[in-house]
UniProtKB/Swiss-Prot annotation:
Phylogenetic placement of the source organism: Bacteria, Bacillati, Actinomycetota, Actinomycetes, Frankiales
Function: Catalyzes the oxidation of 5,10-methylenetetrahydrofolate to 5,10-methenyltetrahydrofolate and then the hydrolysis of 5,10-methenyltetrahydrofolate to 10-formyltetrahydrofolate.
InterPro entries linked: Aminoacid_DH-like_N_sf (IPR046346), NAD(P)-bd_dom_sf (IPR036291), THF_DH/CycHdrlase (IPR000672), THF_DH/CycHdrlase_cat_dom (IPR020630), THF_DH/CycHdrlase_NAD-bd_dom (IPR020631)
Record flagged with keyword NADP: yes
Binding site for NADP(+): 161-163, 186, 227
Subunit and interaction comment: Homodimer.
Keyword field: Amino-acid biosynthesis, Histidine biosynthesis, Hydrolase, Methionine biosynthesis, Multifunctional enzyme, NADP, One-carbon metabolism, Oxidoreductase, Purine biosynthesis
Reactions catalysed: (6R)-5,10-methylene-5,6,7,8-tetrahydrofolate + NADP(+) = (6R)-5,10-methenyltetrahydrofolate + NADPH; (6R)-5,10-methenyltetrahydrofolate + H2O = (6R)-10-formyltetrahydrofolate + H(+)
GO biological process: L-histidine biosynthetic process; methionine biosynthetic process; purine nucleotide biosynthetic process; tetrahydrofolate interconversion
Official protein name in the record: Bifunctional protein FolD 1
GO molecular function: methenyltetrahydrofolate cyclohydrolase activity; methylenetetrahydrofolate dehydrogenase (NADP+) activity
Length: 276
């Protein structure tokens, strides 16, 4: 089984980001990503540190902003960043305050600065094939398949999960690559049978070990987007040991989709800065 190394792919994208950041800085522009933290969630703060560290290596300024005083303060913070000409990209970490939906928060992020595709308009533009930013995790799936030279045109793809961050947008991105996409979810009947017919499986449920050997046809590619923390550490949706003798390729967890997602956020920030 071939392991699709997200870290090496992220490094390749990073070289492009470095070059583009240098060009922007020579023109007097420092590409800047604002990360809004609505609470003290440890996972969100840990990921923000990863973004900061990665951004520092590729020439993008990453600015964390605390917005923990409640829903109104969060929206005020996003509005201020939206109006700030020095800020090129905005992301808001989750979980959000219970009183706010991702749609409500996303509507306050201008599409031009919506580098993680949180604004509903961004998803609409994606559905219509118009220019814009897709959610970075969904985009990372297609980026990995492209860089691994795994054909998508004509491929049968099973997407497990229909959420707005991965499932829905990745299905649209794969359709744009001429794949034949089936989206499965908690009410899907015969999930194992559907998955076993696929050339590519994309799983984004957060259920550890959901995808076992019975899901995977010989030679299929499996993209594991799920992540959960267990007593054994960080794990994905896929039982890697169970499918190792069957699958043709797999993204590991950690080290697969995650590093590419982070770098795509920074590449999107570069593109937003360049457009500005």
């Amino acid at each position: 089984m071939r392991l699709l190394d997200g870290r090496s792919m992220a490094a390749e994208i990073g070289r492009y980001v470095i070059d583009e950041a240098e060009r922007l800085m020579l023109a007097g522009k420092t590409p800047t990503l604002a990360v809004v933290l609505p609470n003290a969630d440890p996972a969100a703060r840990s990921y923000t540190h990863i973004i900061e560290r990665t951004a520092g290596k590729v020439g993008v300024r990453c600015e964390p902003h605390e917005a923990t005083a409640g829903p109104a303060a969060l929206l005020d913070m996003v509005d201020a960043l939206a109006a700030d000409p020095l800020v090129d990209g905005i992301i808001v970490q989750t979980p959000l305050p219970a009183q706010l939906s991702s749609r409500e928060v996303g509507e306050h992020i201008p599409v031009a600065k919506d580098v993680d595709g949180m604004n509903p308009e961004s998803l609409g533009r994606l559905a219509l094939g118009l220019p814009g930013f897709a959610p970075a995790t969904a985009a990372a799936v297609v980026e990995i398949l492209t860089r691994a030279r795994i054909p998508m045109a004509g491929a049968r793809v099973c997407v497990i999960g229909r959420g707005p961050v991965v499932g829905k947008p990745v299905s649209l991105l794969l359709l744009a690559e001429d794949a034949t996409v089936t989206v499965c979810h908690s009410h899907t009947k015969d999930l194992v049978t559907i998955a076993h017919e696929a050339d590519i499986i994309v799983s984004a449920t957060g259920v550890p070990g959901l995808v076992g050997a019975g899901f995977v046809r010989p030679g299929a590619t499996v993209i594991d987007v799920g992540t959960a923390v267990t007593a054994a550490g960080q794990v994905g949706d896929v039982d890697a040991a169970a499918i190792a003798s069957v699958a043709g390729a797999l993204t590991p967890v950690p080290g697969g989709v995650g590093p590419v997602t982070t770098m795509l956020l920074l590449r999107n920030t570069i593109r937003a800065a360049r457009a500005d």
